[in-house]
């Protein structure tokens, strides 16, 4: 696939940060979880740096206990370098999501017995300014083939993990999950996105997320609090 202006650079962390991603899947993915939590695509200071969905550096290293070699994209944006474990910036969305998981479940093992976190699209799209451009804002001629490939990949993930339900983190992820899984019978719902671009999340994402989980039929019994 090729992507034109306003996109100037495309990163695929599954290539240059393959080792941490493989550790994440091998250590934490299991069949039959209560819910697959589905994000959209990598953020420039999260998965783009670590290879882990919502991969805020500190959370990945200190709570998930994942490390490993991280390379660089073949064509790196000068304003969005991949510094890997040395990235000084903290992704707010990842800090909120993994911070909630830590405080609610205590250990990764307890959390991943119930959930798994993945992204719908593995690619990060950057404009010349360094601004992140999400897949839904790509031109239709580029977007449609991308979505078709990501839909197929999502069906493969769901087939492998057999989650009881898929919860899109944000409306776009929910919509894509509904479209991709329409023929499978897997229930699809949503969680509010923890991004600071979501004003409601800035007023308190955790209670919103837990309300959405319960509404989707996910019990939080057995969590620490």
Regions found by a protein language model. Give the residues of each.
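Active-site metal-binding loops of divalent metal-dependent hydrolases
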Residues: 171, 194
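Short, aromatic/basic amphipathic alpha-helical patches
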Residues: 177-184
């Amino acid at each position: 696939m090729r992507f034109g202006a306003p996109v100037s650079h495309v990163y695929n962390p599954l290539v240059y940060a393959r080792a941490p991603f493989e550790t994440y899947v091998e250590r934490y993915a299991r069949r039959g979880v209560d819910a697959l939590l589905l994000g959209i695509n990598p953020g420039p200071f999260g998965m783009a740096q670590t290879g882990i969905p919502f991969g805020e550096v500190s959370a990945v290293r200190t709570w998930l206990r994942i490390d490993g070699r991280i390379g660089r994209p073949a064509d790196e944006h000068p304003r969005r370098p991949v510094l890997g474990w040395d990235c000084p910036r903290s992704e707010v969305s990842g800090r909120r999501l993994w911070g909630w998981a830590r405080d609610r479940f205590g250990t990764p093992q307890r959390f991943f017995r119930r959930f798994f976190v993945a992204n719908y699209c593995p690619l990060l799209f950057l404009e010349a300014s360094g601004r992140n451009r999400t897949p839904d804002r790509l031109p239709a001629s580029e977007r449609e083939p991308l979505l078709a490939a990501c839909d197929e990949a999502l069906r493969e993930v769901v087939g492998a993990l057999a989650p009881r339900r898929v919860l899109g983190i944000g409306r776009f992820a929910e919509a894509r999950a509904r479209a991709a899984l329409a023929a499978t019978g897997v229930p699809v719902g949503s969680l509010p996105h923890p991004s600071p671009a979501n004003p409601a999340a800035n007023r308190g994402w955790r209670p919103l997320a837990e309300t959405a989980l319960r509404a989707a039929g996910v019990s939080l019994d057995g969590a620490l609090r």
